[in-house]
Amino acid sequence: MSQEKQVFSIDLAGRQLTVETGQLAKQANGAVLVRYGDTAVLSTATASKEAKNVDFFPLTVNYEERLYAVGKIPGGFIKREGRPSEKAILASRLIDRPIRPLFADGFRNEVQVVSIVMSVDQDCSSEMAAMLGSSLALSISDIPFEGPIAGATVGRINGEFVINPTVEQQEQSDIHLVVAGTKDAINMVEAGADQVPEETMLEAIMFGHDEIKRLIAFQEEIVQAVGKEKSEVKLYEVDADLNQAVREMAEEDMHSAIQVHEKHAREDAINEVKKRVIEHYEAQEVDADILGQVNEILYKIVKEEVRRLITVEKIRPDGRKGDEIRPLASEVGILSRTHGSGLFTRGQTQALSICTLGALGDVQILDGLGVEESKRFMHHYNFPSFSVGETRPMRGPGRREIGHGALGERALEPVIPSEKDFPYTVRLVSEVLESNGSTSQASICGSTLAMMDAGVPLKAPVAGIAMGLVKTGEHYTILSDIQGMEDHLGDMDFKVAGTAQGVTALQMDIKIDGLSREILEEALQQAKVGRVHILNHMLSVIPEPRTELSAYAPKIITMTINPDKIRDVIGPSGKQINKIIEETGVKIDIEQDGTVFISSINQEMNDKAKKIIEDIVREVQVGEIYEGKVKRVEKFGAFVELFSGKDGLVHISELALERVGKVEDVVKIGDVITVKVIEIDKQGRVNLSRKVLLKEEQEKEAAKEENKQEQQ
């Protein structure tokens, strides 16, 4: 292998993608700099020399954002990047998921893959550059990675699929799909869509896979040129004699324990068998390594039997058929002071979702590498330990919780009404109260119920379902509504959310090399049947969104003003708008186009604030008549307040029909008089007249008198 800098290029969606090796981060096992347009990502892969004493594969994937990549200095006192953003966490998960299945079973060396985003071109995805870079860093290293993999973003504009759409194209696209895989199969899908049919989503996935094959061929050329020879690594294996002895002792009882239908009773039965076997070996005073192997063998016995029951006998751990959904129960409005709430229960999985409506000023402000600056719809997911009957410290959300929250948000966002139709910020919080699999999809169902209870005029209700797969050779079984054991011991977790019309979100993780088109197609169609079944249940509880908002939700009124008048409403240093807020207790949000949103729980105060703003921006027209209060008296005339913030002058000569010697002879401060606008001068000063109206009144009276005399 050469240590000199080498450069490789390929065209990707009309923009050049370049890979540089041999110059940067040479002490890592593998490192590449990927340039895609003006986006630049450094990806590295390192591994420990010795295996770790753990019972899992210790892989860590980090996608690191640097604000210098978009020419920003971090805010706050410290002025450096802190904890990863939500976008960075989601990107890390996106890269981890297609990579993880491609390490040999039993590989226990610690592996860390790091991608640092160094420059960002918004039209050239840094996530896709990082995914390709991560795959390449592993592939050219001596780490025994069974890749490469590649990813592609797919959009659809006017019925045509587009690879790696630009920011402008994404705004027009009704599909936002990220697909990853090997040259032979798909092994990761992440998608949002605007109620798109399953057949179209499948076509989009396969369209993306065609591009993946091309990118993998490109990587294979690079590996051929600069790749290191793979290290010989000893994989974790259990002792053959010990394996046979444990199986003879445990298999029969374990097979019976696994067929207990109820989750906790089944777990207790399995743990009882495990306890008996482990106590047998502890009595022989064997070392920790032997006990570790015993636990590994017991785990494999459970896994093999669960998979055999599903694929051979077509029996699921809880006794259901392959396409059967667990019992459903739903309720809305169970929290009286919240704006909306929905409780969704599916078997032993339960989620309580709460909807809170806020003013547009409550949007989430985003400060990251993307073009999006704010977000008016949010979904947050919490998974407390009591939901699985365990204890652990209560800390902030982890990667999994952030990922599940984002999946729910993506599934629901296509049906959220526009800001014009529903000028509210919407925040959903899903509290998982019980967990036995598919909690992310339960949170989607609960959130739909909560929004309907809150009176959010959804375009359509959304439900979600998690599909599973157990595959042995060419034989496979697809499972609807998987529970925890099926997720843990199966080969696939394929989450599908959508309306009756089509898909709004997909997420697929697998533990095998990949899936064929046929399996994907069957899983999507089976998911549709299950989704419609769940939707029908939800609609039996609340058929449509409530027509009225909660009494505790803010009332919002919208008005439009001349954009040139915005500064008048705000006032110097915000003095005017703060005065309105202090006087009425409302929230006021003003858009650049002159749209004003006024919100509070008190409609009377909303109306009062609106009247004040109308008076501030109101334009005085010549010929208009006002009833105003005398605010100030001078020798030359009286100043009259026409409406809030607007005065005019009635010159002494315009106060009365007769000659006035002294202003105070006609009006005093505080008097309310009727005046007419007779002139607005070049400086915007308003001249008023009382005399004109008196004269007009006098003429009307004279005309009446004349008509009366003619009739006599």
Curated annotation (Swiss-Prot):
Gene behind this protein: pnp
S1 motif domain location: 623-691
Enzymatic reactions: RNA(n+1) + phosphate = RNA(n) + a ribonucleoside 5'-diphosphate
GO biological process, one term: RNA processing
Similarity field: Belongs to the polyribonucleotide nucleotidyltransferase family.
UniProt-recorded name of the protein: Polyribonucleotide nucleotidyltransferase
Keywords: Cytoplasm, Magnesium, Metal-binding, Nucleotidyltransferase, RNA-binding, Transferase
Bridged cysteine pairs (disulfide): none
Protein's organism: Bacillus cereus (strain B4264)
TM region positions: none
Keyword Manganese recorded: no
Binding site for Mg(2+): 487, 493
